[in-house]
Amino acid sequence: MARKCVITGRKTKAGNNRSHAMNSTKRTWGANLQKVRILVDGKPKRVYVSARALKSGKVERV
């Protein structure tokens, strides 16, 4: 199971770290994903859901 929100599609993003000298190195930002049990097609399933989707009420825990 990929680390991606099944509701909003939020996932890891890539970018650069920048030092004071403006040197760049690759880094990643992870989405705030929580593993929760929700109803998928009428059956309880454990999936990754973003904290934003949980707070906004887009998904209901089982």
UniProtKB/Swiss-Prot annotation:
Residues 14-24 have a biased composition (Polar residues). GO terms for biological process: translation. Keywords: Ribonucleoprotein, Ribosomal protein. Pfam families: Ribosomal_L28 (PF00830). The keyword Glycoprotein does not apply. Gene3D superfamilies: Ribosomal protein L28/L24 (2.30.170.40). GO terms for molecular function: structural constituent of ribosome. InterPro entries: Bacterial_rp_bL28 (IPR050096), Ribosomal_bL28 (IPR026569), Ribosomal_bL28/bL31-like_sf (IPR034704), Ribosomal_bL28_bact-type (IPR001383), Ribosomal_bL28_sf (IPR037147). Residues 1-24 are annotated as: Disordered. GO terms for cellular component: ribonucleoprotein complex; ribosome. Belongs to the bacterial ribosomal protein bL28 family. NCBIfam families: L28 (TIGR00009). PANTHER family: 50S RIBOSOMAL PROTEIN L28, LARGE RIBOSOMAL SUBUNIT PROTEIN BL28A. This is Large ribosomal subunit protein bL28. It comes from Bacillus pumilus (strain SAFR-032).
